[in-house]
Structure formats: C-alpha cells, structure tokens
C-alpha cells in the first residue's frame, strides 16, 4: 500500500543535513521511497502547528519499506546527520487514498 511521509522541519545545520540528504538518496530508493515534492515556506496564513522552513514529501511503496529504512542497522550512522541538521521536526505518515470516502465515514 502506497504511503506518504510528510516531513516538516527547520534547518539547524546545513552541512549536517546536506550530508544526510546526500547519503540517504540511495537507501531511500532501495526501500521503495522517492522524494516527490520539496518546498520552502512562503507564508503561513492558517494552522495549529508552528510553521516550518522546509516541506519534504516522500512517497513510499509500503509502510514496511519506511520502517526497514528507519531501522536498517547499516544506516545507524546516517540518521544522526538528520537529527543534528534539523530542528522542530514533524514526521507524519499518510496512507494513500483515491478519494475522501475513507475519512468521511
């Protein structure tokens, strides 16, 4: 089942995050992920969460692939680069739906 990982964050250390992004590209692909959108905050006219500087939307082939990526022991030294590179990290997982019927029940 296709999943979307919504990542919202502020960049704290550009070098650390750049290292994470560079090294994460191949493993993300290996586990069925693909960055499908990135954005830089333009404005925040409405909402309950504090605005974040960066949006990254990753499409995954499955929830299992997400957790394989996150828990791969060979990537143990990779994730700290993300943690050191960002602040105020929000990570939400969404199941793909074709229309709103599943949430309007």
Which role does the model predict for each range below?
Residues 87-91:
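A short, amphipathic edge element
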Residues 4, 84-85:
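Intrinsic disorder/low-complexity signature
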